């Protein structure tokens, strides 16, 4: 009886500890920059789903990854409540985008923001939400700078946004004041391009990071935007790209390919089936003798969002 009681206490303790761990704010994923010639940073982790281990979104938040990134890395997982005992791959390893390692680089295709702090040999990777399909809500590519930043921002929704909300039975005021009901959260960083209509901002919701849910702006978890807000200054370069596939010929001989689902352009598009166009450099990478083109094509079809080695391995005659 005593053993059973003691076991029950330990079980209660570990259940509580797991719940607390999921509830704690996630730390930003900061990695040292790779050596010359490499683009690989980070390291994947594994998560064993506990009994009543929380939703997939809660697990994504714990490791500070995006919801869709976690879903793509674990095909077949229940998107709401993963099965207890299942092992999830946490996609923390990535190839740095093919863009200057300066300021903020956002790859909307992979729903990630990369921040390169000045004077430091590191990069911090944040999951983001971007503009949803339809009308003026798409997030555009651009090269711009931070023009302004503001704590406790108000929100002035556009006429189109107000009309969209009204169609859902929600009457938005002309200006939404700062506070718990403001979907911009507690911090906003304004971009100079397009007249300053696009911002990086927080959120008052627990869902939507790593998804296409915003009205065109870049959405981050509140703890992430708070950290980024404290680090960037007006004039910081911001480069927004749309690159669903990244490749790297690594110094150690690995030939890495990372493929994400391309962004849909129509509501009925299936991003898993949308074609991926290779530029000349990527086509040369695929056609190279060192690359197993069949394996690379398979990686392009699966679209796991994680780097995969597609180098061709030589078969010794003695093993034939």
Swiss-Prot record:
EC number(s) stated in the UniProt entry for this protein: 2.-.-.-
GO BP annotations listed: cell wall organization; peptidoglycan-protein cross-linking; regulation of cell shape
Domain L,D-TPase catalytic: 102-241
CDD domains: LysM (cd00118), YkuD_like (cd16913)
Keyword field: Cell shape, Cell wall biogenesis/degradation, Glycosyltransferase, Hydrolase, Peptidoglycan synthesis, Periplasm, Signal, Transferase
Active site: 201, 217
This protein's record includes keyword Glycosyltransferase: yes
UniProt domain LysM: residue ranges: 45-90
SMART domains associated with the record: LysM
Record-level Gene Ontology MF annotations: glycosyltransferase activity; peptidoglycan L,D-transpeptidase activity
Localisation: Periplasm
Protein's pathway: Cell wall biogenesis; peptidoglycan biosynthesis
One GO term describing the cellular component: periplasmic space
Domain of life where this protein originates: Bacteria
Position of the signal peptide: 1-23
One matching Pfam family: YkuD
Predominant location category: periplasm
Loss of function: phenotype: Simultaneous disruption of erfK, ybiS, ycfS and ynhG leads to loss of covalent anchoring of the major outer membrane lipoprotein (Lpp) to the peptidoglycan. Complementation with ycfS restores some of this anchoring.
Keyword Cell wall biogenesis/degradation: yes
InterPro entries: LD-transpeptidase, LD_TPept_cat_dom, Ldt_C, LysM_dom, LysM_dom_sf, Transpep_catalytic_dom
Protein family membership: Belongs to the YkuD family.
PANTHER family found in the cross-reference section: L,D-TRANSPEPTIDASE, L,D-TRANSPEPTIDASE YCFS-RELATED
Physiological role: Responsible, at least in part, for anchoring of the major outer membrane lipoprotein (Lpp, also known as the Braun lipoprotein) to the peptidoglycan via a meso-diaminopimelyl-L-Lys- bond on the terminal residue of Lpp.
Quaternary organization: Interacts with DsbG.
Protein name: Probable L,D-transpeptidase YcfS
Species, as recorded: Escherichia coli (strain K12)
Gene, per the UniProt record: ycfS
């Amino acid at each position: 009886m005593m053993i059973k009681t003691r076991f029950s206490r330990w079980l209660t303790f570990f259940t509580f500890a797991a719940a607390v761990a999921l509830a704690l704010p996630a730390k930003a994923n900061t990695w040292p920059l790779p050596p010359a010639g490499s683009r690989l940073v980070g390291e994947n982790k594994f998560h064993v789903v506990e009994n009543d281990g929380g939703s997939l979104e809660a697990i994504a938040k714990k490791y500070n990854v995006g919801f869709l990134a976690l879903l793509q890395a674990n095909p077949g997982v229940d998107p709401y409540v993963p099965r207890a005992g299942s092992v999830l791959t946490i996609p923390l390893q990535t190839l740095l985008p093919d863009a200057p390692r300066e300021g903020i680089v956002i790859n909307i295709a992979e729903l990630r923001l990369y921040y390169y702090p000045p004077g430091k040999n590191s990069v911090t990777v944040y999951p983001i939400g971007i503009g949803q399909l339809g009308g003026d809500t798409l997030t555009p590519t651009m090269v711009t700078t931070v023009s302004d930043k503001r704590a406790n921002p108000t929100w002035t929704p556009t006429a189109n946004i107000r009309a969209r909300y009204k169609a859902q039975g929600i009457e938005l005021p002309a200006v939404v004041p700062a506070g718990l009901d403001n979907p911009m959260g507690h911090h906003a960083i304004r971009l100079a391009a397009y007249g300053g209509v696009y911002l990086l901002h927080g959120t008052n919701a627990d869902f939507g990071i790593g998804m296409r849910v915003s009205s065109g702006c870049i959405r981050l978890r509140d703890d992430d935007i708070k950290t980024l807000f404290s680090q960037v200054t007006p004039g910081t370069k911001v480069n927004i790209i749309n690159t669903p596939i990244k490749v790297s010929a690594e110094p150690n001989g690995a030939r890495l390919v990372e493929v994400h689902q391309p962004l849909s352009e129509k509501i009925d598009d299936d991003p898993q089936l949308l074609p991926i166009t290779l530029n000349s450099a990527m086509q040369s990478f695929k056609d190279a003798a060192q690359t197993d083109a069949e394996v690379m094509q398979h990686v392009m079809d699966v679209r796991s969002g994680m780097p995969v080695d597609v180098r061709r391995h030589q078969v010794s005659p003695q093993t034939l």
